[in-house]
């Protein structure tokens, strides 16, 4: 038994539509050659030309010029590495910090096994997964903001 519904080719209305050319490509213009030969190259070359033109006409300086003789007090990583940097900074043992970072994807792999709910359901009907996601988001934002503070107030964000 198949789960796909097959068309009834004995239906005269359907046969009339198929005779006129109705099929999988009935609506709109065909992708070949209209889109692939004419529209796509215009968009691709237009985007490349726009980016090149902006880079030539308005080159922006990113930050201050490098000074090899002046080192900042604390060198921070890129913004997307702030939570990981904060974990390594606040934990006393570096091996423990690496284990905590490895525990994040391992913990996320356990979420489907904790809940015995259909994974295709509405996410708001999966309370454990939703709670873990929200808790992880809050902790990640908290660690990311804390990485920008000095080490002595980084855990409390200077609030306490």
From Swiss-Prot:
Membrane topology listed for this record: Multi-pass membrane protein
Location within or outside the cell: Cellular thylakoid membrane
Gene3D superfamilies: plastocyanin oxidoreductase, Single helix bin
Transmembrane segments: 36-56, 95-115, 131-151
A GO molecular-function descriptor: electron transporter, transferring electrons within cytochrome b6/f complex of photosystem II activity
GO CC, any one term: plasma membrane-derived thylakoid membrane
Keyword Membrane in annotation: yes
Swiss-Prot/TrEMBL GO biological process terms: photosynthetic electron transport chain
CDD domains: cytochrome_b_C
Presence of keyword Membrane: yes
Keywords: Electron transport, Membrane, Photosynthesis, Thylakoid, Transmembrane, Transmembrane helix, Transport
Subunit structure: The 4 large subunits of the cytochrome b6-f complex are cytochrome b6, subunit IV (17 kDa polypeptide, PetD), cytochrome f and the Rieske protein, while the 4 small subunits are PetG, PetL, PetM and PetN. The complex functions as a dimer.
PANTHER family named among the record's database cross-references: CYTOCHROME B, CYTOCHROME B_B6 C-TERMINAL REGION PROFILE DOMAIN-CONTAINING PROTEIN
Family, as annotated: Belongs to the cytochrome b family. PetD subfamily.
NCBIfam families the UniProt entry points to: cytb6_f_IV
Role this protein plays: Component of the cytochrome b6-f complex, which mediates electron transfer between photosystem II (PSII) and photosystem I (PSI), cyclic electron flow around PSI, and state transitions.
Protein name: Cytochrome b6-f complex subunit 4
Organism field: Microcystis aeruginosa (strain NIES-843 / IAM M-2473)
């Amino acid at each position: 038994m198949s789960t796909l519904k097959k068309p009834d080719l004995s239906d005269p209305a359907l046969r009339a539509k198929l005779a006129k050319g109705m099929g999988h490509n009935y609506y709109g213009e065909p992708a070949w050659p209209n889109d692939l030969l004419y529209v796509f190259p215009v968009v691709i070359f237009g985007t490349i030309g726009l980016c090149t033109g902006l880079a030539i006409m308005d080159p922006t300086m990113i930050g201050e010029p490098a000074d090899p003789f002046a080192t900042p007090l604390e060198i921070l990583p890129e913004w997307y590495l702030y939570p990981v940097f904060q974990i390594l900074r606040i934990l006393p043992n570096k091996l423990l910090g690496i284990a905590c970072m490895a525990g994040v994807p391992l913990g996320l792999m356990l979420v489907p096994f904790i809940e015995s709910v259909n994974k295709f359901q509405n996410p708001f009907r999966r309370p454990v997964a939703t709670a873990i996601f929200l808790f992880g988001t809050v902790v990640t934002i908290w660690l990311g903001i804390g990485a920008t503070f000095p080490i002595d107030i980084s855990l409390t964000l200077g609030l306490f």
